[in-house]
């Protein structure tokens, strides 16, 4: 399989293909692909948080990151992204997990979509809400560096309260109470 040339929001297509292979090799790694023939035209990835990021600090086996969602330009507008993300959450597959995604405006295709940063954020929030993900507050400096950046989270119905509390401690480093 090859990557569509327009799948370059996070890295060059060949490098992104290598990253997908690496994620597929992770025990917790999950990838949903959209393809036409042998060409990948969209993908969604799930994996544990990078060990260099704050989200890994809690050492939580039930915390997984929706790391990326991308659809090639010419395939946008057909609901492919929404269908991929809904498939990932179908049939209670992630009810035992806290799933989070960090939305940073610098990864968004503002130029290609001709959307403002706020309209793009609304579009991303709508997409994430289609699987029950909602905005969560955090004091993470990268997220707080721009008001359009955000943390979206879905807490599965089978996640224990102790994990939710641990996630809250990771979300807020600067608070003693929340």
Annotated model-derived regions:
Residues 1-11, 97-178:
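Terminal substrate-recognition subdomain of acyl/acetyltransferases
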Residues 4-8, 65, 70-75:
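Surface-exposed cleft-lining segments at the edges of enzyme active sites
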Residues 11-36, 41-64, 69:
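A conserved beta-strand-loop-helix scaffold within acyl/acetyltransferase catalytic domains
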Residues 20-22, 85, 125:
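Short amphipathic alpha-helical segments and helix-helix/interface helices
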Residues 53-56, 75, 109-112:
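A generic structural signal for short coil/turn motifs at secondary-structure boundaries
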Residues 65-66, 87-92, 101:
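Hydrophobic, well-ordered secondary-structure scaffolds
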Residues 71, 77-93:
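Conserved acetyl-CoA-binding loop-helix of GNAT-fold acetyltransferases
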């Amino acid at each position: 399989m090859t990557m569509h040339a327009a799948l370059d929001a996070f890295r060059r297509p060949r490098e992104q293909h290598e990253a997908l292979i690496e994620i597929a090799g992770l025990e917790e790694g999950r990838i949903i692909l959209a393809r036409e023939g042998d060409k990948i035209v969209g993908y969604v990835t799930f994996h544990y948080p990078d060990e260099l990021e704050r989200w890994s600090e809690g050492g939580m086996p039930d915390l997984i990151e929706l790391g990326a969602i991308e659809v090639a330009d010419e395939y946008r507008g057909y609901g492919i992204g929404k269908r991929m993300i809904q498939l990932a959450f179908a049939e209670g597959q992630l009810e035992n997990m806290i799933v989070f995604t960090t939305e940073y405006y610098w990864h968004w295709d503002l130029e290609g979509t001709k959307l403002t940063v706020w309209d793009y954020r609304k579009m991303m929030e709508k997409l994430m809400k289609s699987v029950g993900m909602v905005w969560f507050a955090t004091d993470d400096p990268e997220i707080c560096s721009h008001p359009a950046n955000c943390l979206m989270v879905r807490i599965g119905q089978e996640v224990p309260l102790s994990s939710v509390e641990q996630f809250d401690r990771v979300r807020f480093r600067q608070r003693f109470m929340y």
